[in-house]
């Protein structure tokens, strides 16, 4: 049974939850038997997961049917509980002795047609129209970031791919992230901390006193210093080769604690040349010291640029990892929330962070929240240098 928890001020806090099964409140049936409850909030098409362990030493717990829908509310007694979503039961485990029943459920939105393979070709459309079409046939509501809606998609094949896999591939090419939450198909700019309507997600501030464990690691930033992508099309009957080098130009002059050594401003004299697009060429984001070459050959220079920029940004976000377990659970935190921290090492405190994964744990020790964070990129402009070969 979950008990109260005392904090330093002497105030007694007790975690609280509410659980419904097919819209019927079953909280009272579970509360005295609850050993642990873990809810994992993922981003992208990795399904959110709910794990519940119940004491069944008297053998009176009835096994729920696979396919039943659980809805979870989570928080603290005396405060409004937050709805954490619907979960469809797909695994049941009973073990002993002592007898324990484990119920595992995953996001209801990730079952069914989204995972069915399809064969389809898309022509002369936009990301906004494409996502809306897929959302409609999966009985979802599309929500696409304004900066992505009008990106043209001249042609792309969905060959024996599920809609989930296909949309993930499309998102990777265009620096986006795709997920399904509360009946909505979200297609948003990756790492932007923006909602689909273009409004910023409010920043949260965490101090070291909020957590009881943390871990920080800096990755090998020198592994890749740039990304190249090639394109090939037939607009120009006389093939020309063109190489375009991308460099970051911060909008504000400030020192980012974890900035990639190759992600630096360039001279103001550098300007992108306006000229007819070459039939084929190569686009590079970053520097040429140690380049990651994308294997896909894109249909246009614009597509190659977006793919290279998306991959380069992803590499930049991975230069460091930071995780923290909050001693007092925060049901209001979710992936893509921007976070500032204080009380740690300078290099950690000075960096802007973005939540990539949230794990809520409820057991006899209390209610805790584990956060996994990645580097939040500042808004940047790009300068391109074109060299004809």
Curated annotation (Swiss-Prot):
Listed A to Z, the keywords are: Late protein, Viral baseplate protein, Viral tail protein, Virion
State the name under which the record lists this protein. Answer: Probable baseplate hub protein
Ranges for the region named Disordered are: 236-281
Domain of life, per lineage: Viruses
Q: Where is the composition biased (Basic residues)?
A: 240-254, 263-272
Gene Ontology annotations for the cellular component aspect, listed alphabetically: virus tail, baseplate
- What does the similarity note say? Belongs to the P2likevirus baseplate hub protein family.
Query: Does Repressor show up as a keyword for this record?
Result: no
Q: State if DNA repair is listed as a keyword.
A: no
Q: How does it assemble?
A: Homotrimer.
Q: What induces it?
A: Expressed in the late phase of the viral replicative cycle.
Q: Which InterPro entries match?
A: Phage_Baseplate_Hub
Q: Where in the cell is it found?
A: Virion
Please give the organism: Escherichia phage 186 (Bacteriophage 186)
Q: What does this protein do?
A: Putative baseplate hub protein.
């Amino acid at each position: 049974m979950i008990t109260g928890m005392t904090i330093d001020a002497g105030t007694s806090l007790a975690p609280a939850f509410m659980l419904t099964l097919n819209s019927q409140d079953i909280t009272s049936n579970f509360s005295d038997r609850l050993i642990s409850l873990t809810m994992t909030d993922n981003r992208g098409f990795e399904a959110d997961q709910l794990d519940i362990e119940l004491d069944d030493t008297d053998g009176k717990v009835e096994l729920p049917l696979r396919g039943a829908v659980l809805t979870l509310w989570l928080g603290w007694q005396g405060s409004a509980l937050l709805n954490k979503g619907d979960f469809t039961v797909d695994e049941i485990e009973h073990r002993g002795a002592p007898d324990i029943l484990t119920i595992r459920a995953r996001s209801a939105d990730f079952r069914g047609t989204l995972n069915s393979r399809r064969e389809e070709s898309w022509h002369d459309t936009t990301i906004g129209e494409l996502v809306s079409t897929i959302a409609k046939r999966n009985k979802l509501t599309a929500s696409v970031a304004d900066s992505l809606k009008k990106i043209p998609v001249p042609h792309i094949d969905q060959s024996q791919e599920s809609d989930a896999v296909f949309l993930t591939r499309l998102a990777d090419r265009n620096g986006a992230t795709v997920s399904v939450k509360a009946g909505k198909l979200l297609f948003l700019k990756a790492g932007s901390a923006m909602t689909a309507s273009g409004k910023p997600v409010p920043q949260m501030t965490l101090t070291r006193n909020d957590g009881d464990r943390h871990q920080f690691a800096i990755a090998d930033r020198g592994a890749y210093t740039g990304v190249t992508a090639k394109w090939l099309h037939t607009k120009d009957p006389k093939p020309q080769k063109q190489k375009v080098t991308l460099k970051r130009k911060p909008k504000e002059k400030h020192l980012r604690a974890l900035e990639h050594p190759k992600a630096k401003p360039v001279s103001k004299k550098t300007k992108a040349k306006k000229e007819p697009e070459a039939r084929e060429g190569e686009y590079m984001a970053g520097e040429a010291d140690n380049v990651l070459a994308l294997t896909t050959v894109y249909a246009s220079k614009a597509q190659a640029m977006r793919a290279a920029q998306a991959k380069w940004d992803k590499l930049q976000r991975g230069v460091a990892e930071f995780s923290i377990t909050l001693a007092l659970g925060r049901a209001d935190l979710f992936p893509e929330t921007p976070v500032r921290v204080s009380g740690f090492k300078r290099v950690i405190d000075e960096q802007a962070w973005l939540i990539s994964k949230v794990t809520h744990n409820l057991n006899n020790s209390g209610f805790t929240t584990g956060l996994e964070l990645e580097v939040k990129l500042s808004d940047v402009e790009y300068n391109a240098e074109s060299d004809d070969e």
